[in-house]
């Protein structure tokens, strides 16, 4: 009888263990912590809206908002060949610095401006000279459409240009031997 009770208890424990069913896998790419210096989103609550104005009419729209955590924005827009709008927004970054962006959005796209945006490097001098030369050629009526013109690449024509422009003098005394 004792063996029967032990066997029944063992079967009961085994049957009551893990029940078959779906268990969602843990997302392995989500970090459990955020290293220092990285942005950590504020998950403790939402900021209260201090001001929210909105006006929409057939002529266009206008809105403005401000929240208690320092986020603010405003925009106006009119319908003329699509929607043309301009506005600005500002917020405090994770580093404590105030960031402000003004923008224009129209047929030319979205064009933001801000003091914190990176500035492009200066144009190299060779490119500036090339652009100036292209402008001079265009003003003189010289256009290069990019297609091949045999006369333009004729060796006699190239030599004549070189002599005229650069005082090119061909070397007739020395010709290196070609070894194949």
Swiss-Prot record:
Cellular component GO terms held in the UniProt record: chitin-based extracellular matrix
Keyword tags: Cuticle, Signal
Protein name, entry field: Cuticle protein 3
Keyword match Protease: no
Leader sequence segment: 1-16
Molecular function terms from GO: structural constituent of chitin-based larval cuticle
Pfam families documented for this protein: Chitin_bind_4
Every Chitin-binding type R&R domain range: 58-121
